[in-house]
């Protein structure tokens, strides 16, 4: 299984509050899809999927404080199409 972390990018503040997942484990995602939301002072920010695949694990949950650079969850890479 090839897992890719969903990493919280640097938002200009060391911490953010995790708000919600837009997808649930087992659901497919495409690169660039919004998969989660975090809140920083004065704004809510969407977190995008870094790759195509399936959300496999959530590490952050609503109300959690999360740090820039920390993984929020993992996406299993979509297997290559068979020719």
Predicted regions and their residues:
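Short hydrophobic beta/alpha edge segments that flank linear recognition/processing sites
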Residues: 30-48, 67-81
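Residue-level signal for short amphipathic helical patches enriched in basic/charged
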Residues: 24, 42, 50, 61
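Acidic, low-complexity mobile loops and tails
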Residues: 1-34, 46
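Short peripheral tails and domain-boundary helices/loops at the edges of structured domains
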Residues: 52-67
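Short, small/polar residue-rich loop motifs at catalytic or cofactor-binding pockets
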Residues: 14-17, 42, 52-53
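Actinobacteria-biased recognition of intrinsically disordered, low-complexity terminal regions
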Residues: 1, 82-83
